[in-house]
Amino acid sequence: MGKVGRIVYPDTCILIYWLERNSTYVDAILQRLRPALESPPILVFTELTRMECRVKPLQTDNQIQLAAYDRVFSTPGYRFEKLTREVFDVATELRAQYGLKAPDAIHLAAALSSGCDEIWTNDDRLAKAAAGRIGVFNVKERNVTYT
């Protein structure tokens, strides 16, 4: 394995698109991951991400899909950010300033507090709130912006 690459916080939708092979977005996600093969990104998650990903497989009793998510969340080298009071304080400020939904504000606050280089999302409001604070890969636009 090569040197460690950038630190990336994938929004829940990115993981769902990737693991469920969403025909609209999976190619853009794989293209973004491909240059990282020599220096793979460190993916950062929270228990909120894990919870959101596991809901549908549990509702539909899809044990194969559930196991796939559980494998990702137990991959060595990936990190879990603790949701501390400080993370929630930042999330509260982001929610108040940008009108984010609570989970999106928590995701962005976790990405910022864990020192991520990029957040990957499909959510325009989340991307706008993240702009200027962290690199943003907007899967819809298929580009990364740093400001």
Locations of regions flagged by a protein language model:
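Short, well-structured N-terminal submotif of metal-dependent ribonuclease cores
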Residues: 1-45, 58-67, 138-147
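Acidic, PIN/NYN-like endoribonuclease modules and their adjacent C-terminal/linker elements
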Residues: 1-7, 35, 79, 108-147
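Alpha-helix capping/helix-boundary segments
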Residues: 14, 49, 87, 107, ...
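Acidic catalytic patch
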Residues: 21, 49, 75-97
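A general structural signal for well-ordered alpha-helical segments in protein cores
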Residues: 26, 50, 66-69, 88
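Helix-adjacent hinge/juxtasegments
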Residues: 60-81
